[in-house]
């Protein structure tokens, strides 16, 4: 079970999973395709670690991303850089933390940036394989 939260950015949302805790530890579903209501199908997963205070982005790619913080915390931002979008130029930010295992879905052609609020580790799932020729940095 998850709570799916809409944002002001067209097709951007964030997920807050239900965590099951007991004396052994924690279990939660950080991604399930039926949670997304999109055609998102991950084909690549990436690991990214950053030191506290690191600012990364804004990176724009032609593929969608699903970002989860598995250690520490970040302020994560989606920027709508799609010229034909009704929400073009708007942005949405959310704190992603390893204590909540919440995730942000970033639509294709939107920008992505984050500030590491503490040392952190992010896992990105993408619906296409990375191609450096298609990556744009602002």
Identify the meaning behind each predicted range.
Residues 96-118:
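Conserved metal-binding segment of the jelly-roll/cupin
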Residues 1-99, 120, 124, 128-138:
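Non-catalytic, conserved peripheral segments adjacent to functional cores
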């Amino acid at each position: 079970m998850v709570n799916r939260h809409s944002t002001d950015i067209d097709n951007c949302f964030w997920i807050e999973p239900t965590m099951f805790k007991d004396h052994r530890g924690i279990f939660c579903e950080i991604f399930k395709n039926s949670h997304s209501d999109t055609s998102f199908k991950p084909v690549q997963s990436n690991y990214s670690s950053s030191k506290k205070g690191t600012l990364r982005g804004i990176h724009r790619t032609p593929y969608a991303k699903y970002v989860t913080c598995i250690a520490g915390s970040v302020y994560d931002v989606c920027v709508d850089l799609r010229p034909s979008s009704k929400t073009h130029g708007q942005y949405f930010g959310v704190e992603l933390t390893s204590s909540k295992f919440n995730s942000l879905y970033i639509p294709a052609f939107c920008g992505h940036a984050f500030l590491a609020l503490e040392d952190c580790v992010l896992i990105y799932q993408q619906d296409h394989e990375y191609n450096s020729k298609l990556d744009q940095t602002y």
